[in-house]
């Protein structure tokens, strides 16, 4: 369901040949002195925990002859576990630079590997592990700041292409986090509406049934990731 909605949405926008010419680079929207304070974060852990996957992407990048693509996907396991992504997105050419457990913090640290030196026509960002109900979580405000840091950097490197921010999705495994997810989604939606070149895509609303309850038939057994119905 999420996949079909997004595929249709993305394809329509990619067909708009004038879109890229109309995108303007916004001024930096994040203002801070020296650093963003983040609690419960071990720098070594966040730097090295997924180094194996980053090394694999570095190896791929060295042998990648054509770095152009219609869509560059950045994010966490919900992108990584989209098993049929190449088939579902066909005939669009995609490049996936996602890894399970990715958070905004390590995505920024690994930015040069996962997000630079490519030639995409659009970029999709989906990451939700900064608000996952763990001791390492950021606050909603910190998460929003890191989203802006990431999108600002993407827009500096790719000033003429559209960037799609997928909303946080509710899940059975993280139901207690839904109130925070709704707040961050509201912030991201407003931010995208005021920033040229950014588009917010709501993938949360369609996961509820007619009774207002979160659907159970669209999740894998872990209650977090989507199955083929989702």
Task: List the predicted regions and their residue ranges.
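Conserved beta-strand elements of the Class I
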Residues: 72-74, 95
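Non-membrane alpha-helical structural segments and their capping/turn regions in soluble enzymes
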Residues: 137-148, 178, 182, 228
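Active-site segments of SGNH/GDSL-like serine hydrolases
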Residues: 126-132, 152-183, 204-208
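Extracellular/periplasmic catalytic domains that process cell-envelope and extracellular macromolecules
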Residues: 64-67, 88-89, 116-117, 157, ...
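Oxyanion-hole/transition-state-stabilizing segment in secreted/luminal serine hydrolases
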Residues: 79-95, 106-144, 164, 168-172
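Generic structural signal for well-ordered alpha-helices
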Residues: 111, 147-152, 185
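N-terminal secretory targeting modules
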Residues: 1-71, 87
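Catalytic His-Asp segment of secreted/periplasmic serine-dependent ester chemistry enzymes
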Residues: 170-230
